[in-house]
Curated annotation (Swiss-Prot):
This is Platelet glycoprotein Ib alpha chain. Keywords: Blood coagulation, Cell adhesion, Disulfide bond, Glycoprotein, Hemostasis, Leucine-rich repeat, Membrane, Phosphoprotein, Repeat, Signal, Sulfation, Transmembrane, Transmembrane helix. It comes from Mus musculus (Mouse). The record marks 588-589 as: Cleavage. The lineage of its organism: Eukaryota, Metazoa, Chordata, Craniata, Vertebrata. LRR repeats lie at residues 48-69, 72-93, 94-115, 117-140, 141-162, 165-188, 189-210. The chain crosses the membrane at residues 613-633. Residues 406-429, 460-526 are annotated as: Disordered. GO terms for cellular component: cell surface; external side of plasma membrane; glycoprotein Ib-IX-V complex; membrane; plasma membrane. Residues 221-282 form the LRRCT domain. Residues 634-734 are cytoplasmic.
Length: 734
């Protein structure tokens, strides 16, 4: 009997219960088999399982082939299952989350083929010593990778190249000593990087690239601060608000930045970002970023002109205009140097003294000032008589001129030097330091056959002035400064010295000015004025003043480069023209602007000054006109308004003859004489009032108390005059 009772109490095999709990989470079926002491996958799992928990069991090994028939499986948790190996011989096409944490895995197989849709992979707290280079191949959808708390000592190059959508990378608590330089290449979506608690000593140059990492954890490493850490130091300085100190159980978004947590292990835990880097090279190879603050100063360069006394031809090219045609065979260069500030230099000259000439000091100061201006100016002062027996001042061979604008050809037996002139100084009978770097040379008669592209004009001695295209002032004899780029030719037996660009030689007793635009004058052996003007006027501005006993300073703005050879160079471009026994005084120089500026009155400075004044006067006139109009309008309105008011009052009186307003006092009787209403030609006006009957609380109506009576007109005939009758209670109204 007892045995029958025991058999009845035993559970029937037909009614076996499930070992795992099943629940529905959203649209996925969740099966929880945690801590069931399982050694293999349960056989009674639902086929539509979407979330499977197998943690805290003793599985040992696991193969993805056992889950192939679970086509809806999306989340798989295998944490704390004492796994030592993982086999990926089955394809789980929908699996997105795989948790393999807290196991004994020492290696990982390739996961790309078996898990193509994987987005989160957690292999933390295992015993991984290394990773194969292709372990993540095929995981193009991976967004989170957790590898913390392993034994990783190094990472293969290109490990993360397949995972271009990676957002979180956790490599904390490993034994990493170094990182591959291109580890983060292509990870544009990466926002959180955990590298704390490793054995890192430095970060390779360019490791972070152009990534904007909002959350980075770098503390508790063996950072060694030397010259190799300068890149990492600069990155910390630039991203100080993105470096955090990790705290267990605290979300990264709840922590505060702490860049000082990254410390140097060899400098008493000093912050890496404050490492001074003394003695380290500062070459561009030390940094992998663009430093826009350290802009090196560009050294200013100056254009130098060299020319020689041999028979070769040299050509000068203006930087802003085309050079004149010439037969030059030398190389040509065009240079635009920057504008220089005024400089003061000294040049030493060796001079010889001739009888009757004023002695110049050996040391002369030159203050050339260069500015960026464009001018079309021709300087034409009066001619100056120059004897052919002048004394040459020979400069020493280490001074370079800054300007030259001529092309000069000298045959072998010629003694004509090539001076360049831009500044003219004519002090009177005294020894004055003159700003100069050029020399006036009185050549001997020579024959210089040189082809030229300018117009050749032969002028006989005369006193007839030739028309010019600029304002010409002919004061007392002086020296002419004419820039030119034409080729100079002096005929045979000429007694006229050959000037270049700015020196004009005029024989005695010649008063004939020479045209100053595109004209080359070649005199015969006579006392005729010789002048050279380029066929192409260079853009030049020259300001020339001649105070007594004061050097004349000329401000020039023209940049060009000329290649010449074998002649001592000059620093400035000034010509000193002596006269026998005295210096000629230059009282006046005509400064002629271009024809365009003369013909246009709007370019005149006086006109520009009067233009605002004119607009101001017009504005005042307009204001005055508007005020007068306003005054007239107000005056007209003042006269018109009274008439309008009279008309309105008349209309009101006409209307009032047919309207009467009566005020009746509230009393028992109102006496109204009929004579008051005789002027009304019609029926009597009707009155309408309201009568309120007050009802006492006891229900009685009336009699009416004092102060609550109907109007006087309603007594006796009130039934015809009353409009509406309202009934009110003592307490409230209906």
């Amino acid at each position: 009997m007892a045995l029958l009772i025991l058999l009845f109490l035993l559970p029937s095999p037909l009614h076996s219960q499930h070992t795992c709990s099943i629940s529905k989470v959203t649209s996925l079926l969740e099966v929880n088999c945690e801590n069931k002491k399982l050694t293999a996958l349960p056989a009674d799992l639902p086929a539509d399982t979407g979330i499977l928990h197998l943690g805290e069991n003793q599985l040992g090994t696991f193969s993805t082939a056992s889950l192939v028939h679970f086509t809806h499986l999306t989340y798989l948790y295998l944490d704390r299952c004492e796994l030592t190996s993982l086999q990926t011989n089955g394809k789980l096409i929908k699996l997105e989350n795989l948790d393999l944490s807290h196991n004994n895995l020492k290696s990982l197989p390739s996961l790309g083929w078996a898990l193509p849709a994987l987005t989160t992979l957690d292999v933390s707290f295992n015993k991984l010593g290394s990773l194969s280079p292709g372990v993540l191949d095929g995981l193009s959808q991976l967004q989170e990778l957790y590898l913390q708390n392993n034994d990783l000592k190094s990472l293969p190059p290109g490990l993360l190249l397949p995972t271009t959508k990676l957002k979180k990378l956790n490599l904390a608590n490993n034994k990493l000593r170094e990182l591959p330089s291109g580890l983060l290449d292509g990870l544009e979506d990466l926002d959180t990087l955990y590298l704390q608690r490793n054995w890192l000593r430095t970060i390779p140059k360019g490791f972070f690239g152009t990534l904007l990492l909002p959350f980075v954890f770098l503390h508790a490493n063996s950072w060694y601060c030397d010259c190799e850490i300068l890149y990492f130091r600069h990155w910390l300085q630039e991203n100080a608000n993105n470096v955090y100190l990790w705290k267990q159980g605290v979300d990264v978004k709840d922590t505060t930045p702490n860049v000082a947590s990254v410390r140097c292990a060899n400098l008493d835990n000093a912050p890496v970002y404050s490492y001074p880097g003394k003695g380290c090279p500062t070459s561009s190879g030390d940094t992998d970023y663009d430093d826009y603050d350290d802009i090196p100063d560009v050294p200013a360069t100056r254009t130098e002109v060299k020319f020689s006394t041999n028979t070769k031809v040299h050509t000068t090219h203006w930087s802003l205009l085309a050079a004149a045609p010439s037969t030059s065979q030398d190389s040509q260069m065009i240079s635009l140097p920057p504008t220089h500030k005024p400089t003061k230099k000294q040049s030493t000259f060796i001079h010889t003294q001739s009888p009757g000439f004023t002695t110049l000091p050996e040391t002369m100061e030159s203050n050339p000032t260069f500015y960026s201006l464009k001018l079309n100016t021709v300087l034409i002062p009066s001619p100056t008589t120059l004897e052919p027996t002048s004394t040459q001042a020979t400069p020493e061979p280490n001074i370079q001129p800054m300007l030259t604008t001529s092309t000069l050809t000298t045959p072998e037996h010629s003694t004509t030097p090539v001076p360049t002139t831009t500044i003219l100084t004519t002090p009177e009978h005294s020894t004055i330091p003159v700003p100069t770097t050029a020399i006036l040379t009185t050549p001997k008669p020579s024959t210089i056959p040189v082809p030229t592209t300018a117009t050749l004009t032969t002028l006989e001695p005369s006193t007839t002035p030739v028309p010019t295209t600029a304002t010409l002032t002919t004061p007392e004899p002086s020296t002419t400064l004419v820039p030119t780029t034409a080729t100079l030719t002096t005929p045979e037996h000429s007694t006229t010295p050959v000037p270049t660009t700015a020196t004009l030689t005029t024989p005695e007793h010649s008063t004939t000015p020479v045209p100053t635009t595109a004209t080359l004058t070649t005199p015969e052996p006579s006392t005729t004025l010789t002048n050279l003007v380029s066929t192409i006027s260079p853009v030049l501005t020259t300001t020339l003043t001649t105070p007594e006993s004061t050097p004349i300073e000329t401000i020039l703005e023209q940049f060009f480069t000329t290649e010449l050879t074998l002649l001592p160079t000059l620093e400035s471009t000034t010509t000193i023209i002596p006269e026998q026994n005295s210096f000629l005084n230059l009282p006046e120089v005509a400064l002629v602007s271009s024809d365009t500026s003369e013909s246009s009155p709007f370019l005149n400075s006086d006109f520009c000054c009067f233009l605002p004044l004119g607009f101001y006067v017009l504005g005042l006139l307009w204001l005055l006109f508007a005020s007068v109009v306003l005054i007239l309008l107000l005056t007209w309105t003042w006269h018109v308004t009274p008439h309008s008011l009279d008309m309105e009052q008349s209309a009101a009186l006409a209307t009032s003859t047919h309207t009467t307003s009566l005020e009746v006092q509230r009393a028992r009787q109102v006496t109204m004489p009929r004579a008051w209403l005789l002027f009304l030609q019609g029926s009597l006006p009707t009155f309408r009032s309201s009568l309120f009957l007050w009802v006492r609380p006891n229900g009685r109506v009336g009699p009416l108390v004092a102060g609550r009576r109907p109007s006087a007109l309603s007594q006796g005939r009130g039934q015809d005059l009353l409009g509406t009758v309202g009934i009110r209670y003592s307490g409230h109204s209906l």
